[in-house]
């Protein structure tokens, strides 16, 4: 049975960062059953290739024990390529954009 999915405190900031960088974002955190929090579509300025990314948001300010994947998420990640993003810097790295603090 699917559990109610908690939304990480930094998800709004992560979503806004993706959008500010030109990505389309669909928030899917309510899907449950291990499905990632975000579906992100982004066209790389380097090669103009359109990419669709499955992204799990974890709050990097929490201790590692609070950032672990649930068993359902682990199963989903074993079947599909998913990316874990814990910070704005991670968004830049995932999209291969230079991050300036």
Regions found by a protein language model. Name each.
Residues 1-101:
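Catalytic phosphate/metal-binding cores of nucleic-acid and nucleotide-processing enzymes, i.e., regions
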């Amino acid at each position: 049975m699917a559990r109610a999915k908690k939304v990480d405190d930094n998800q709004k900031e992560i979503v806004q960062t993706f959008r500010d960088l030109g990505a389309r974002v669909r928030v899917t955190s309510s899907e449950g059953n291990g499905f990632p929090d975000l579906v992100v579509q982004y066209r790389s300025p380097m090669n103009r290739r359109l990419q669709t990314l499955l992204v799990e948001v974890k709050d990097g300010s929490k201790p590692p024990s609070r950032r672990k994947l649930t068993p359902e998420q682990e199963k989903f990640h074993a079947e599909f390529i998913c990316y874990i993003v814990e910070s704005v810097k991670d968004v830049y790295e995932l999209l291969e954009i230079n991050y300036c603090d």
